[in-house]
A protein has these predicted regions:
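Catalytic-site microenvironment of enzymes
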Residues: 1-182
């Protein structure tokens, strides 16, 4: 009985996550459109965004109580964001489009993702990940940025504000970081 209850809770949580992602994507679309209007009539080639679906292949990331793998959630969200951006005539480069690991080791995998980002010089690079907590009451999306990047901090603020408009109960703040992960 406990197992069935946990399974149902897991399914409800996943349904909520998917619905939340849909709402977030709609709000992000509006926010991004407003931001892009301030950039002006830039050529499509100047409007490149790199989307990185974290983990992949044998690296599943976190695994939920219902067996859902972070790598799969990341790829689903990233594909949804890609569709929204492409509707706005923004060229999207994906670090991965399938369930694949980009290199043999985690370090090499991360380096390859960074290489993709550096080669295309995007206006924005976003890596999608999920966090897990032992406490059930901890929730909400949080945006991290590289601590010495003022542009990254500004972009993180715009994205975090859009996320909080969708879910006002999300009290998370943007967070600077200097570690090497995407």
């Amino acid at each position: 009985m406990q197992r069935k209850i946990r399974l149902m809770i897991g399914i409800l949580i996943m349904t909520g996550l998917i619905a939340g992602c849909w709402k977030v994507s709609k709000n992000l679309q509006k926010e991004l459109k407003e931001e892009m209007e301030t950039i002006g009539e830039a050529e499509k080639s100047d409007r490149i965004v790199v989307l990185d679906a974290g983990h992949g292949g044998t690296d599943s990331g976190k695994v939920g109580i219902n067996g859902v793998k972070e790598k799969d959630i990341n790829l689903t969200i990233t594909n949804s964001v890609k569709k929204i951006l492409e509707k706005e005539n923004i060229q999207v480069i994906m670090t991965r489009e399938t369930d694949e690991q980009l290199a043999q080791s985690k370090v090499e995998d991360l380096k390859y993702r960074v290489k993709i980002m550096n080669e295309v010089s995007p206006i924005l690079a976003v890596s999608i990940h999920q966090n897990s907590y032992h406490e059930e009451n901890v929730f909400g999306a949080q945006v991290f940025y590289y601590q010495t990047s003022t542009e990254g901090e500004k972009a993180a603020g715009i994205i975090q504000d859009a996320l909080q408009k969708v879910n006002p109960d999300n009290t998370k703040k943007i967070k600077a970081n200097d570690t090497y992960y995407i």
